[in-house]
Amino acid sequence: MKPTTAQQVNTLLYYLQTKQTPPFKILFWENLQKIDFDYSANSLQQLSRFFAAMAKRHIQLPQLLANQSGQALVVALAAYIADYLAKTTGQAIAWYDYDTMSAQLARQNKYPTQSQLPVDFYASLTARIGHKVYCQPLKLLPDLLQGKDVLPQFIAQMTQTVYQQSQVNLLQSPEAVCQGYLAK
Protein backbone atom coordinates (compact mmCIF):
# COMPACT_ATOMS: atom_id res chain seq x y z
CA MET A 1 0.00 0.00 0.00
CA LYS A 2 1.32 3.41 -1.00
CA PRO A 3 2.02 5.79 1.90
CA THR A 4 -0.27 8.80 2.20
CA THR A 5 0.90 12.30 1.39
CA ALA A 6 0.97 13.09 5.11
CA GLN A 7 3.12 10.02 5.83
CA GLN A 8 5.58 10.93 3.08
CA VAL A 9 5.81 14.56 4.22
CA ASN A 10 6.17 13.62 7.88
CA THR A 11 8.95 11.17 6.99
CA LEU A 12 10.87 13.92 5.20
CA LEU A 13 10.31 16.34 8.09
CA TYR A 14 11.47 13.69 10.58
CA TYR A 15 14.82 13.29 8.82
CA LEU A 16 15.30 17.06 8.52
CA GLN A 17 14.65 17.58 12.23
CA THR A 18 16.59 14.62 13.60
CA LYS A 19 19.46 14.97 11.12
CA GLN A 20 19.50 11.18 10.77
CA THR A 21 20.57 10.01 7.34
CA PRO A 22 17.45 8.82 5.53
CA PRO A 23 17.33 5.45 3.73
CA PHE A 24 16.78 7.41 0.50
CA LYS A 25 18.83 10.20 -1.02
CA ILE A 26 18.06 13.87 -0.46
CA LEU A 27 20.06 16.23 -2.64
CA PHE A 28 22.48 18.48 -0.72
CA TRP A 29 21.95 16.41 2.44
CA GLU A 30 25.32 17.52 3.87
CA ASN A 31 24.31 21.18 3.49
CA LEU A 32 20.93 20.57 5.10
CA GLN A 33 22.71 19.26 8.19
CA LYS A 34 23.88 22.82 8.87
CA ILE A 35 20.30 24.11 9.13
CA ASP A 36 18.51 23.92 12.48
CA PHE A 37 15.05 22.71 11.52
CA ASP A 38 13.72 23.66 14.96
CA TYR A 39 10.89 26.03 13.98
CA SER A 40 12.79 29.10 15.14
CA ALA A 41 13.20 32.38 13.27
CA ASN A 42 16.86 31.40 12.94
CA SER A 43 15.87 28.31 10.97
CA LEU A 44 14.15 30.53 8.40
CA GLN A 45 17.23 32.73 8.12
CA GLN A 46 19.39 29.65 7.58
CA LEU A 47 16.91 28.36 5.00
CA SER A 48 16.97 31.71 3.18
CA ARG A 49 20.78 31.57 3.07
CA PHE A 50 20.59 28.02 1.70
CA PHE A 51 18.28 29.17 -1.11
CA ALA A 52 20.52 32.19 -1.78
CA ALA A 53 23.53 29.86 -2.14
CA MET A 54 21.58 27.70 -4.59
CA ALA A 55 20.59 30.82 -6.54
CA LYS A 56 24.26 31.85 -6.80
CA ARG A 57 24.98 28.45 -8.30
CA HIS A 58 22.09 29.03 -10.77
CA ILE A 59 20.23 25.94 -9.59
CA GLN A 60 16.66 26.08 -10.83
CA LEU A 61 13.57 24.02 -10.08
CA PRO A 62 13.64 21.89 -13.27
CA GLN A 63 17.18 20.77 -12.40
CA LEU A 64 16.08 19.75 -8.91
CA LEU A 65 13.03 17.89 -10.18
CA ALA A 66 15.08 15.91 -12.71
CA ASN A 67 15.92 13.20 -10.16
CA GLN A 68 14.41 11.66 -7.04
CA SER A 69 16.93 13.11 -4.61
CA GLY A 70 16.17 16.61 -5.91
CA GLN A 71 12.44 15.95 -5.67
CA ALA A 72 12.89 14.85 -2.05
CA LEU A 73 14.80 18.07 -1.33
CA VAL A 74 12.11 20.25 -2.91
CA VAL A 75 9.23 18.57 -1.09
CA ALA A 76 11.09 18.48 2.23
CA LEU A 77 11.89 22.21 2.17
CA ALA A 78 8.41 23.20 0.99
CA ALA A 79 6.89 20.99 3.69
CA TYR A 80 9.08 22.56 6.37
CA ILE A 81 7.89 26.04 5.37
CA ALA A 82 4.22 25.06 5.69
CA ASP A 83 4.87 23.06 8.86
CA TYR A 84 6.69 26.08 10.32
CA LEU A 85 3.52 28.14 9.77
CA ALA A 86 1.36 25.54 11.46
CA LYS A 87 3.66 25.05 14.44
CA THR A 88 4.33 28.75 15.07
CA THR A 89 0.62 29.61 14.88
CA GLY A 90 -0.44 26.64 16.99
CA GLN A 91 -2.64 25.19 14.26
CA ALA A 92 -3.10 21.64 13.04
CA ILE A 93 -1.86 20.80 9.57
CA ALA A 94 -3.26 18.39 6.99
CA TRP A 95 -1.48 17.45 3.78
CA TYR A 96 -3.12 16.90 0.42
CA ASP A 97 -1.88 15.73 -2.94
CA TYR A 98 -3.52 17.03 -6.12
CA ASP A 99 -6.32 14.44 -6.30
CA THR A 100 -7.22 14.68 -2.62
CA MET A 101 -7.21 18.49 -2.71
CA SER A 102 -9.39 18.55 -5.83
CA ALA A 103 -11.89 16.25 -4.12
CA GLN A 104 -11.77 18.43 -0.98
CA LEU A 105 -12.54 21.56 -3.02
CA ALA A 106 -15.40 19.81 -4.81
CA ARG A 107 -16.94 18.87 -1.44
CA GLN A 108 -16.59 22.42 -0.12
CA ASN A 109 -18.22 24.12 -3.12
CA LYS A 110 -21.83 24.88 -2.29
CA TYR A 111 -22.66 25.48 -5.94
CA PRO A 112 -21.48 23.63 -9.02
CA THR A 113 -18.57 25.59 -10.44
CA GLN A 114 -16.01 25.13 -13.14
CA SER A 115 -13.16 26.28 -10.90
CA GLN A 116 -10.52 23.64 -10.40
CA LEU A 117 -6.98 23.42 -9.19
CA PRO A 118 -4.54 24.00 -12.00
CA VAL A 119 -2.93 20.79 -13.13
CA ASP A 120 0.65 21.76 -12.37
CA PHE A 121 3.53 20.89 -10.11
CA TYR A 122 2.68 23.59 -7.55
CA ALA A 123 -0.74 22.09 -6.82
CA SER A 124 0.77 18.67 -6.12
CA LEU A 125 1.32 19.52 -2.43
CA THR A 126 -1.16 21.57 -0.42
CA ALA A 127 -1.21 22.09 3.32
CA ARG A 128 -4.38 23.01 5.17
CA ILE A 129 -3.34 25.02 8.21
CA GLY A 130 -6.06 25.23 10.82
CA HIS A 131 -9.51 24.78 9.33
CA LYS A 132 -9.63 27.43 6.63
CA VAL A 133 -6.18 28.35 5.30
CA TYR A 134 -4.67 26.47 2.39
CA CYS A 135 -1.00 26.86 1.55
CA GLN A 136 0.86 25.66 -1.53
CA PRO A 137 4.48 26.08 -0.42
CA LEU A 138 5.89 24.76 -3.70
CA LYS A 139 4.81 28.03 -5.35
CA LEU A 140 7.40 29.86 -3.27
CA LEU A 141 10.39 27.87 -4.50
CA PRO A 142 10.98 29.46 -7.94
CA ASP A 143 11.36 32.91 -6.34
CA LEU A 144 13.63 31.54 -3.61
CA LEU A 145 15.78 29.78 -6.20
CA GLN A 146 16.13 33.06 -8.12
CA GLY A 147 17.66 34.66 -5.04
CA LYS A 148 14.59 36.67 -4.05
CA ASP A 149 14.32 37.03 -0.28
CA VAL A 150 10.57 36.40 -0.17
CA LEU A 151 10.47 33.92 2.71
CA PRO A 152 10.11 36.44 5.60
CA GLN A 153 7.32 38.29 3.81
CA PHE A 154 5.53 35.04 2.92
CA ILE A 155 5.72 33.82 6.52
CA ALA A 156 4.46 37.18 7.87
CA GLN A 157 1.52 37.33 5.45
CA MET A 158 0.52 33.71 5.95
CA THR A 159 0.84 34.00 9.74
CA GLN A 160 -1.48 37.00 9.70
CA THR A 161 -3.94 35.11 7.48
CA VAL A 162 -3.90 32.06 9.76
CA TYR A 163 -4.51 34.20 12.85
CA GLN A 164 -7.35 36.11 11.16
CA GLN A 165 -9.04 32.90 10.03
CA SER A 166 -8.71 31.27 13.45
CA GLN A 167 -10.40 34.08 15.37
CA VAL A 168 -13.73 33.25 16.93
CA ASN A 169 -16.61 35.63 16.21
CA LEU A 170 -18.53 36.01 19.49
CA LEU A 171 -21.59 37.30 17.61
CA GLN A 172 -22.21 33.86 16.12
CA SER A 173 -24.53 31.29 17.62
CA PRO A 174 -23.30 29.68 20.88
CA GLU A 175 -22.74 26.39 19.04
CA ALA A 176 -20.57 28.08 16.41
CA VAL A 177 -18.55 29.91 19.10
CA CYS A 178 -17.96 26.63 20.98
CA GLN A 179 -17.00 24.88 17.77
CA GLY A 180 -14.57 27.71 16.97
CA TYR A 181 -12.86 27.38 20.34
CA LEU A 182 -12.78 23.60 20.21
CA ALA A 183 -11.29 23.72 16.71
CA LYS A 184 -8.26 25.51 18.12
Describe the predicted segments one by one.
Residues 14-15, 39, 80, 84, ...:
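Sequence-level detector for tyrosine residue identity
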